[in-house]
């Protein structure tokens, strides 16, 4: 637990730009909201093979916020990856379940965080609302 706290605090310290703590945390909160909105849209769309698009879109929108948004997107994406791995391994008893999907999701998240257009992952026929 101490190690996790130290890692989070160090990443916070290194992630803060010259703009100050307030803008960094504001960007982080807004980036978290962007990821949440993309997740909610993914659930609402309920469209097959659209997960990568929504992951890329959420990370792209968080990246547009600034360094705080990028930091929040990395923390949330990494936490989701590890939590999903723990669930698969210890709760479901499956070690490599969804490994290809997880790697494709990571690629989409990195694509969005790098500032590239998330529509690269947009599936055909997804309603324009999303």
Curated annotation (Swiss-Prot):
- Quaternary structure (record): Apolipoprotein of the HDL complex.
Q: Give the protein family.
A: Belongs to the SAA family.
What sections of the sequence does the record tag as coiled-coil? none
Keywords on record: Acute phase, Amyloid, HDL, Secreted, Signal
Q: What is its main location?
A: secreted
What residue spans carry the Basic and acidic residues bias annotation?
A: 121-130
Q: What is this protein called?
A: Serum amyloid A-4 protein
Organism annotation = Mus musculus (Mouse)
Tissue expression: Expressed by the liver; secreted in plasma.
Has keyword Isomerase? no
What function does this protein fulfil? Major acute phase reactant.
An individual GO BP term: acute-phase response
Show the GO cellular component annotation of the record.
Answer: high-density lipoprotein particle
Q: List the InterPro entries.
A: Serum_amyloid_A, Synovial_Prolif_Regulator
Q: Which disease is it linked to?
A: Reactive, secondary amyloidosis is characterized by the extracellular accumulation in various tissues of the SAA protein. These deposits are highly insoluble and resistant to proteolysis; they disrupt tissue structure and compromise function.
Q: What induces it?
A: Upon cytokine stimulation.
Which residues does UniProt assign to the signal peptide? 1-18
* Chain spans, region Disordered: 109-130
Q: Where in the cell is it found?
A: Secreted
